[in-house]
């Protein structure tokens, strides 16, 4: 396994638990967010013998990284936290060179709930853009707040908070229930971080959680036997 997080603390948060579960971490690297040539890093990955590359890309250019990984036909599939790869047009934007990348996301056109696909399609129809994860949360939050106010029969802050704490709402991405710290609960049927893979024709297949899986993992085309 090779790991390329841009932040030192993130590097340790990935490397330590990976080792704890028995993963063989071959190397970890940091790089400047302005990096335009990833070939030296990709060469290290290739020579490391790693079977999978985990990335954490936020401020760096995901487009450039994916293109160079693809063009070099690096024999190591990759995925992780890649903010720009969460964009619905990422695959088409870089000419399909994101094929097989697995990226964490919340907003994927998949039957996460009965609301997901209708919302996704209506959003695209009305805005000409694909929704990102913030769109899911913003949409749901309006309805959650409105229902809490209705139950409270008031806009009084304390009364509304008490009703918000009772929330059990089927959202676009999963059921929304708050815990005692007012965080959204995760778990089967609830809101979850989804890992989805870019596949042929720009389709995204959900690989995790298992109960939401819509496809199977594929290798980059040049690694297929």
Regions inferred by a protein language model and the residue ranges of each:
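Segments of small-molecule ligand-sensing domains
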Residues: 125-135, 146-207
């Amino acid at each position: 396994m090779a790991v390329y997080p841009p932040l030192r603390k993130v590097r340790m948060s990935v490397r330590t638990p990976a080792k704890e579960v028995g993963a063989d971490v071959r190397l970890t690297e940091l790089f400047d967010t302005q990096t335009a040539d990833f070939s030296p890093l990709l060469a290290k990955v290739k020579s490391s013998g790693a079977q999978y590359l985990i990335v954490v890309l936020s401020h760096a250019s995901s487009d450039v990284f994916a293109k160079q990984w693809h063009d070099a036909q690096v024999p190591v599939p990759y995925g992780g936290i890649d903010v720009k790869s969460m964009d619905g047009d990422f695959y088409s934007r870089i000419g399909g060179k994101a094929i097989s990348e697995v990226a964490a996301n919340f907003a994927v056109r998949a039957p996460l709930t009965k609301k997901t696909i209708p919302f996704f399609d209506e959003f695209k129809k009305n805005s000409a853009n694909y929704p990102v994860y913030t769109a899911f949360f913003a949409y749901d939050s309006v309805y959650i707040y409105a229902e809490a106010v209705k139950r409270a029969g008031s806009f009084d802050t304390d009364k509304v908070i008490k009703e918000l704490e009772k929330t059990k709402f089927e959202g676009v991405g999963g059921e929304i229930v708050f815990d005692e710290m007012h965080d959204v609960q995760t778990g089967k049927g609830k809101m979850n971080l989804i890992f989805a893979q870019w596949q042929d024709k720009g389709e995204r297949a959900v690989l995790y959680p298992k109960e939401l899986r819509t496809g199977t993992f594929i290798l980059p085309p040049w690694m297929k036997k």
